[in-house]
Design a protein with these regions (language model features):
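Active-site neighborhood of HAD-like aspartate-dependent phosphohydrolases
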Residues: 1-31
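Short acidic-hydrophobic, aromatic-tinged amphipathic segments that line or gate anion-handling sites
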Residues: 92, 159-171
């Protein structure tokens, strides 16, 4: 798109406008294209994700998937999750990045205030822009899924632990669980 080709490993910033050196209008076009249903449905699963999440659900843990995707991407995102055997996991879209410009009162859309009213003891995050949001949850352990765009980011505090894949995420979860029993 726009004649720009940046390999995945070279995506240095979560802010794609900065990574690809885009104009405001190019960035808006990219964000729209990236959230078209056909594009969302074609994303590959990160190895081990559905297996690990389903393991936690099978163990009786309450699991939610909370994304900063636009509110109108809920249906294709829900469909993708269902196709990847995550139909038991509720999905919520939260305006984490201030991109939503109109109020939508769907049960699966949350404001930041609604999100902060929830309680979590474990989170998995890869967006440096969202680290601040998960910092609100007292006592929450945060597994930071290493990505090229977050690897250079300083972690906010010792509740944040870097993980290379879902096996490491699950180990961090198991250690947290062992400490709680």
């Amino acid at each position: 798109m726009f004649g720009i080709d940046v390999p995945y490993r070279e995506v240095q910033f979560f802010n794609l406008k900065k990574t690809f050196d885009l104009t405001d209008s190019q960035y808006e076009e990219l964000m729209k294209a990236g959230h078209f249903p056909d594009n969302l449905l074609n994303y590959e699963e990160t190895p081990g994700a559905s297996e690990t999440i389903n393991k936690w659900v099978d163990m009786g843990h309450e699991v939610f998937i909370i994304t900063g995707r636009p509110f109108n991407s809920y249906e294709p995102s829900r469909h993708w999750l269902d196709e990847h055997k995550l139909e038991r996991v509720p999905l919520y879209c939260v305006d984490k990045y201030g991109r939503e410009n109109c109020k939508q009162d769907y049960v699966y859309n949350l404001t930041l205030e609604q999100l902060y009213g929830m309680s979590f003891d474990f989170a998995v995050e890869d967006s440096p822009a969202a680290f601040w949001h998960v910092s609100h949850f007292e006592g929450c352990r945060i597994a930071v899924f290493n990505r090229p765009w977050n690897i250079r980011e300083e972690l906010p505090d010792d509740r944040f632990i870097r993980c290379e894949g879902w096996k490491e995420v699950d180990k961090v979860f198991e250690i947290k669980e062992a400490m709680n029993t």
